[in-house]
Design a protein with these regions (language model features):
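Structural scaffold elements adjacent to functional motifs in cytosolic proteins
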Residues: 41-43
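Short, surface-exposed ligand- or partner-binding patches at beta-edge/loop junctions that are enriched
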Residues: 92-93
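Rhodanese-like catalytic fold shared by cysteine-dependent sulfurtransferases
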Residues: 2-6, 18-37, 47-88, 97-135
Length: 135
């Protein structure tokens, strides 16, 4: 099952440049607006990344892939239990690559309707001197 999911995600990556994404990309100003409205943000990086850079205050920390790039088996099930498919959800990673893959999968294959990807991830957030909380 995990192998099939990983294969599916690789296919999504390969095809992602072919069309407009089915999710919305956010810049930092748009992200601040969404956070101000109470939209949850999921930081899908690994624990060592959270400790290295810090996280946006209020982020829900849930690792998507291990250090070998394998999708963690419980990730999608946990997300399905915590986020309704019609509720907005923001995804952030280091540079926006992992989250764009995940956002596409959530919208195209799992029926999520309001998925937001933070373009350029936490790297741009920090580069723009935005605040982070250290773990």
């Amino acid at each position: 099952m995990l192998f099939r999911l990983y294969g599916l995600l690789l296919l999504v990556i390969a095809l992602s440049g072919c069309a407009e994404p089915p999710y919305s990309n956010l810049d930092n100003e748009q992200l601040e607006t969404m956070l101000g409205r109470g939209v949850p943000i999921y930081d899908i990086r690994r624990a060592e990344e959270w400790h290295q850079t810090g996280v946006i205050e209020g982020s829900r920390l849930q690792t998507f892939v291990d250090d070998s790039g394998r999708v963690l088996p419980d990730f999608l099930a946990h997300l399905s239990r915590t986020v309704d498919k019609d509720d907005p959800v923001i995804l952030i990673c280091r540079t926006g690559n992992r989250t764009s893959t995940l956002a596409r999968h959530l919208t195209e294959h799992m029926g999520y309707t309001q998925v937001y990807n933070v373009r350029n991830g936490i790297t741009r957030w920090i580069g723009d001197d935005r605040p982070v909380t250290r773990l």
